[in-house]
Amino acid sequence: MRSSADTRACGSGMSRRSFVTAAGVFGAGAVLAGCAKKDDTASSSALELDENGMSNQSLSTEPFAYDSVVWGGCHVNCGSRCPLKLYVKDGTVVRVSTDVDGSDDFKPGGIYQMRSCLRGRSNRQRIYNETRIQKPLKRVKGTKRGEGKYEEISWDQAISEIAEIMKDVKEEYGNDAFYIQYGTGQLGGTVSKSWAPDVTALARMMNCWGGYLRHYCDYSTGQITWELPLFNGDAWSNNEVTDLVNSKNIVLWGNNPANTRMSGSAMVWLITWVKENNPDANIVVIDPHLSDTAIGVGTQWVPVRPGTDPALVAGMLHYLHTEGRLDESFIREKFIGFYSDTFVDDVKQGEPTSNAFMGFDADGTLSIDEDMSYEAYLMGAGTYRGTGEKTPEWASSICGVPADTIRWLADLYMDGPTATIQGWGPQRHANGGNVTRSIAMIATLTGNVGISGGGTGAREGTGGVPYKIPANLPNFADRNSVETCISFFDWYQAIEDYTVMDDRTWGVRTIDATGATTYARKPGDIKLKAPIKFIWNYASNVMLNQHADVNDCLRIFNLPDEKDSGLRCVVTHDIYLTPTAMISDYILPATTSYEETDIIKGGTAWTGFACCESPAIDPMFECKPIYEVCRLVAAELGVEEDFTEGRTQEDWVEWLWEQGKEAGDDIGATFEEFKEKGLWKQTDEHTPAIAKPEAIKTPSGKYEVFSKQAYNLSKQWDLTCGGVIPDDGYDQITGLPVWYVAKEAYGDDAAMKDYPFQLIGHHTKSRTHSSYGNVAWLESVHPQQLWIN
């Protein structure tokens, strides 16, 4: 049991015991999915505070006193955005409540409540957490990154020394040696946001000074972003969730919103609403583990071995194809690569016509004259002769789903409309690109795309009525002189040995001011020009937490600073002493969202909101917001006027609000009134959007079951990454979304012999990535646990 000192350190107005008691009343899942609606009207009863200004009251309907109420928001990366109501007494946040304005029922033209889950409501434990960084810190000279030995320094010293290092790096390597790390610890704001890195205050500051090395894609969607478009040209579009009331069947494929998007403004409340309003729908959850979503809303749970989804889909399609259930004329008109008799002509249509597509074959040497169609794959013919038919029984032996269940699933897709909503877990495997393509393929081949009640097989579309307030400050991307970019995942290689990194080995691309990336005209044309020497790490715990093989990363962080490898400097600006902060050379204390001014936006279904966040409390300790840090550095670099344009952070917030009004936001208030009210909502009566692909953005303009882009890449790319990775045959790029044996996955007999259990990760309720991972209340209700089948 944690000590009372631990509880006090969290700045709570509710004790851990009271929180756990609430969990016992509602059930842990219910508590973390959102408490019942209550009247949060305050009374004049006195609130007792201890010597630290902490409340001693528990969670209850007892009256409590406060001086002021301030609107804020939850800024973590859960995929939704919720407003929060902060009650302040004597300069201390004593209670965090939620939105209770409007109805809890979704309907066109209705204003509904966007209630925060208990992660959001536990934010006092984040504000007053004992792990908060209080002063600027500098790594002690002679110590290694990761040892955790730091000395306190002044802000003046920190800014001066950081700026001098930046000047030295630029003089020696140019702007190519600077990198802004991926970080999602501060999402949803405008001025304060940490993601996407290219629209942050850091990006604006760096672009004022010549730019930095950018990256493409992100840790959430590393494979679906680029591989799903190989099939349908679009990684994101799907029917709006409220259209699920028109579905006969709903398939949540690797999608667990009860954990990942569990607030009142997110998917879990929407799918609960759908279940209530469409009670006869079959809700099938395909997932390796029995998730809270499967238990809470599912009518059928289909456990599948991780990474074997392409085999499951192949078994379904073999059954439908051999039974004559598929619409042949529809497939021949809208798809290429499915049937054997047209395959060679099909792939000519799918040839990339320019380097706007991956796998552009400038010399025209990668033609195909043999049958590599999906039909051949299913039947064990053509190139796949000798591999056997991909019957449901074959699929069952791989994916673990009984053959009769595979047939039942296939029938479900033919007896639609059937909606498919794919989470982002399935694509987080070595063969994740084929997984994500195959899931979308079964939805599309069975005629469930472009219709009400159907869906594309991508992530859900949540709708909303967005305000037109810009999502970020102008970032001056046109001033960025660095023309190359790398994958979000490959920064570590650019530290150790950038010389092996080009388009063919590590996927290096060119990038323009809009963020659009272009592929090489010929393999090997695009090369990285410099090592990463300086990293800005804001609100990010990627480098020693979310990233893979962190032990090897620690080795890379401590490489000597030499001409072509090794870091010169890592600067972390964060709220907490995270593992990533502890490998930094300078650690700068950041304000929470509740100590600065900003705007957040959000919404779902028929409601949208804009929230003007005002500081609930003064900045604690010596903490500064990212805008102020960038201003100070910009001043040292001689670009302060360019960076600020003479505006403070609050001035920028007002400017953004004015831009929204000019773009058509009908708020009907002055900025002071906007700030005073805090939370604004709007609604409409739109019909739920249906994803209707009028123009499919593939080379052929059709759905590409066989991707010539992928096939060409398999011939052009060096899958050893320039000799860095062993040529062991595990890594593959395939034209068809087929199942193959991936390293340390099911079917890898060498690994399974010694390690019969396969370890996978899944999101828990108690945290979002590592955000909220230091909140004692949440951990006590939902501790980190290992599940085993």
List the model feature ranges, each with a label.
Residues 183-184, 334-335, 412, 455-466, ...:
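A glycine-rich phosphate-binding loop feature that marks nucleotide/adenosyl-phosphate handling sites
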Residues 277, 289-415:
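Long, well-ordered, tryptophan-enriched scaffold segments
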